């Protein structure tokens, strides 16, 4: 990675996910202080960070503040009755993130978004509980200090309590001013994403200390625009229309621009496996404003053609496993 010019490594959550199925996802954490034993130990993770640093590569840790896994040891004896939202009973989130910024939204609509659960196996944590809020803040600070992290990626950022996010981001940036933190706010509306960036000062007075967010709008525009005919609102105009809204961001140059990620179809697949368009997308990504992020396997044209199954999208990198016909580390079997 260092030879290819990468300066940071972002791993999906490496903490314990003690579940009977789909544990490869990593987002249903069952112990916030322990690396999943299938990966190794806390010490081996810290050594990985140190080894990467010696090569000029920093480590970005994927953190989950909104929910945990239903197999977390908390579930056996909750610290308090309000540790989870909705009386610890599954009530699905609406995923309508816009309600948090909508001046016309009903309070119940906002609550259903932020207090609802993703799925029944991911209890939604109540950060309005001061003990839980302190726990999550201290846990984040501990991992930065213990492992020597250079950055944090926060999953499902806007789903957590807004007041808590203000305090969490304040504490993190106060303690580590040079630590970059990127939040996941999956919206194709730049204004919705910009609400969370430090310095935005929206009309409702919300204060955020979050330095960076993922630019989902630009990724979507590239994936669609490069394969479309030019029209009033299609083709390359999609990309222009997104960039033309940069004024809503306090710092568009600190947004993370990305080719694709583990939650969506790979760009190579989305572009019909056309190498010319894929190269064009990468060239744009690496030269436009923002911090570029590339998913593993992009360099060997990994694809999920014909399926949106996340297990396929997140397939193992070829090589290093017994029986692999292709080895992308050595070049064996590659076309």
Report the location of each language-model feature:
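Substrate-binding/active-site clefts of carbohydrate-active enzymes
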Residues: 3-147, 165-175, 180, 191-192, ...
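Short, flexible loop/turn elements at secondary-structure junctions
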Residues: 15, 36-39, 65, 158, ...
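Active-site-proximal helices and loops of the catalytic beta/alpha 8
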Residues: 49, 67, 72-76, 139-141, ...
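Short catalytic-loop micro-motif centered on adjacent basic/acidic residues
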Residues: 60, 151-157, 267-268
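Short, basic, glycine/proline-bearing loop/turn elements
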Residues: 30-34, 259-270
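Hydrophobic faces of well-ordered beta-strands that scaffold small-molecule active sites
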Residues: 9-11, 59-61, 152, 181-183, ...
């Amino acid at each position: 990675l260092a030879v290819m010019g990468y300066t940071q490594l972002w791993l999906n959550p490496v903490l314990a996910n003690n579940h009977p199925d789909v544990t490869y996802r990593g987002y249903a954490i069952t112990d916030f202080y322990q690396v999943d034993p299938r990966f190794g130990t806390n010490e081996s993770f810290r050594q990985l960070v140190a080894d990467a640093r010696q090569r000029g590569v920093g480590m970005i840790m994927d953190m989950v503040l909104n929910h945990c896994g239903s197999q977390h040891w908390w579930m056996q004896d909750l610290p308090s009755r309000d540790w989870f939202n909705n009386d610890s009973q599954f009530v699905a989130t609406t995923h309508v993130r816009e309600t948090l910024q909508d001046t016309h939204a009903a309070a119940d609509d906002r609550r259903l978004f932020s207090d609802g659960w993703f799925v029944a196996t991911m209890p939604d944590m109540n950060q309005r509980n001061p003990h839980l809020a302190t726990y999550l803040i201290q846990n984040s600070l501990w991992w930065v200090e213990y492992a020597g992290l250079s950055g944090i990626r926060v999953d499902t950022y806007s789903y957590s309590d807004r007041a808590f996010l203000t305090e969490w981001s304040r504490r993190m940036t106060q303690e580590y001013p040079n630590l970059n933190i990127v939040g996941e706010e999956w919206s194709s509306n730049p204004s919705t994403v910009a609400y969370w960036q430090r310095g935005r000062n929206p009309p409702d007075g919300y204060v955020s200390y979050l330095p960076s967010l993922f630019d989902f709008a630009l990724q979507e525009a590239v994936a669609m625009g490069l394969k479309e005919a030019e029209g009033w609102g299609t083709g390359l105009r999609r990309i222009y229309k997104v960039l033309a809204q940069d004024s809503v961001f306090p710092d568009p140059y600190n947004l993370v621009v990305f080719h694709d990620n583990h939650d969506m179809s790979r760009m190579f697949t989305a572009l019909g496996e056309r190498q010319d368009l894929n190269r064009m997308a990468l060239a744009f990504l690496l030269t436009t404003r923002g911090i570029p992020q590339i998913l593993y396997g992009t360099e060997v044209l990994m694809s999920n053609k014909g399926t949106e199954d996340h297990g396929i999208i997140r397939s193992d990198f070829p090589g290093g496993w017994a029986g692999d016909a292709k080895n992308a580390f050595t070049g064996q079997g590659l076309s």
